[in-house]
Regions:
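Glycine- and aromatic-enriched membrane alpha-helices
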Residues: 1-161
């Protein structure tokens, strides 16, 4: 598992450098986390080489997924959808290649079941929270920055837009 995380971090770093012209630590950290997420689907069967291959593929995938979601204007500030959703699905689909007891169709059904469960429960949870308090900050608070609006100070004063 640690090999996958390490390879994913390095691959994500290289993919970010290729895509943006500079190394991106956040992408590397998301790559490391993504490696651990993907290998969790079937950690006992991949060989070290297979774990390395899955890691390399996922490192590039997490960067591409984050960029795609940004272009689609899907609000995912920390890359959670890419790390846990996109790369988690990759991990599910990789299991049959390293475990003869698993099938692609079974993994696809499992992935669809997970998606439906998470979507429905998240939707209902946010609707219930919305009855009690706003789920999103106002436009004014967003422009000001949530750290200032909610805490009264800047979380990262060294970063100015």
């Amino acid at each position: 598992a640690s090999r996958a995380g390490n390879v994913w971090a390095v691959t994500a770093l290289l993919a970010a450098k290729a895509a943006f012209g500079k190394a991106d630590l956040t992408m590397a950290l998301n790559g490391c986390l993504a490696g651990l997420v993907a290998i969790t689907a079937g950690p006992d069967t991949p060989s070290p080489l297979a774990a390395t291959f899955i890691g390399g593929l996922g490192g590039a995938l997490v960067v591409g997924s984050i960029v795609t979601l940004d272009k689609l204007k899907i609000d995912d500030p920390v890359g959670a959808i890419s790390v846990h959703g996109t790369v988690g699905l990759l991990g599910l689909l990789a299991v049959p290649f390293t475990n003869s007891d698993a099938s692609i169709s079974g993994q696809l059904i499992g992935g669809a079941t997970i998606f439906v469960w998470v979507f429905v429960t998240s939707f209902l949870t946010f609707k219930l929270i919305g009855f009690v308090m706003p789920v999103r900050v106002s436009d004014e608070e967003e422009e000001m920055g949530s750290d200032i609006a909610e805490c009264g100070l800047e979380a990262y004063p060294e970063f100015k837009a």
